[in-house]
Regions:
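Acidic beta-to-alpha connecting loop that harbors the catalytic carboxylate
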Residues: 30, 199-201, 233-236
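Alpha/beta-hydrolase active-site loop
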Residues: 72-106
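Short, flexible, mixed-charge acidic loops at enzyme active sites
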Residues: 62-77, 155-159
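Primarily recognizes the serine-hydrolase "nucleophile elbow" in alpha/beta-hydrolase
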Residues: 97-159
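Short, surface-exposed "cap/lid" segments of acyl-processing enzymes
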Residues: 6-70
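C-terminal catalytic histidine-bearing segment of alpha/beta-hydrolase fold enzymes
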Residues: 210, 218-260
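The feature captures the conserved acid-bearing segment of alpha/beta-hydrolase catalytic domains
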Residues: 149-221
């Protein structure tokens, strides 16, 4: 059902079963016409928790004033500082507000476990939430997200035919989005983390994901079963391919959120 929490529009799905009531937030980067399809592709049927599908700021059905033309202007003017970073930063701020509101409205315990799912830019938002950690996060699934701002900018250059001009301000911003460098922040409390890359995903370089894995692994030395990286064959970077990772994501979140 369509809902709102903390002033943020979202789709909300009740659990088919639940124990003490956790919550899964899925960051949705899909266009307006794909909003319902995103939620249908990721039902998380085994997870005994409420699911909230939260649109990313500045994209999809949360486009800025001016719509697609304004998004295009930002892409070409300064993709990182005017589009990507504001979208990710606002998403992390939204997360804390939405979770607080939903816990009150749905009568969830204050310490009910929180799981995240993010695809593409939504995956970057989930990684940033793990690194900044505005609220405790028990588990996360990241799909089709690069390891840092440089990879995201390179993908945008290929997709939109732009040449990005790196400025000192952009370099400062990129440091916050350098997730291998922030591995110790991401791993605080050893949240259960599953990272999935499609073998055919040209937007996410395998070398970058390997670097993220190498940076995170030492932080999970005492809990190796809580960190998993998977490369799946026959999967690229399309929203229409999320169904191919749905079962894996469902299993992971179910395993790590229902022990509570």
């Amino acid at each position: 059902m369509q809902a709102e929490a903390g002033g943020v529009p979202l789709l909300l799905r009740a659990p088919s079963r639940r124990r003490r009531g956790g919550l899964v937030i899925a960051f949705d980067p899909s266009p307006p016409e794909g909003r319902e399809a995103f939620a249908r592709a990721l039902p998380f049927p085994s997870v005994g928790a409420w699911k909230a599908y939260l649109g990313l700021p500045l994209v999809g059905y949360r486009q800025p004033h001016g719509g697609v033309e304004e998004i295009t202007r930002r892409q070409r003017s300064d993709y990182l500082l005017q589009l990507l970073d504001p979208a990710l930063s606002d998403a992390v701020r939204d997360l804390a507000v939405v979770v607080s509101d939903l816990r009150k409205r749905l009568d969830l315990a204050p310490d009910a476990p929180l799981g995240l799912f993010g695809f593409s830019a939504g995956g970057l938002a989930a990684l940033l939430a793990l690194a900044d950690r505005p609220i405790p996060i028990a588990a996360a699934v990241i799909v089709g997200a690069g390891p840092d701002a440089e990879a995201a900018v390179a993908a945008a250059e290929r997709a939109f035919g732009i040449t990005y001009q790196w400025t000192p301000a952009a370099r400062v911003c990129a440091a916050r989005l350098d997730f291998p460098a922030r591995a110790s922040n991401i791993a605080r409390g050893t949240p259960a983390l599953l990272v999935i890359r499609g073998a055919d995903d040209e937007a996410v370089p395998a070398t970058g994901i390997d670097r993220l894995h190498a940076a995170l692994r030492p932080n999970y030395i005492h809990a190796p079963d809580r960190l998993r990286f998977e490369t799946l064959t026959g999967i690229g970077h399309g929203l229409d391919e999320l169904g191919k990772v749905a079962a894996l994501a469902d299993d992971w979140l179910s395993e790590h959120l229902t022990d509570w």
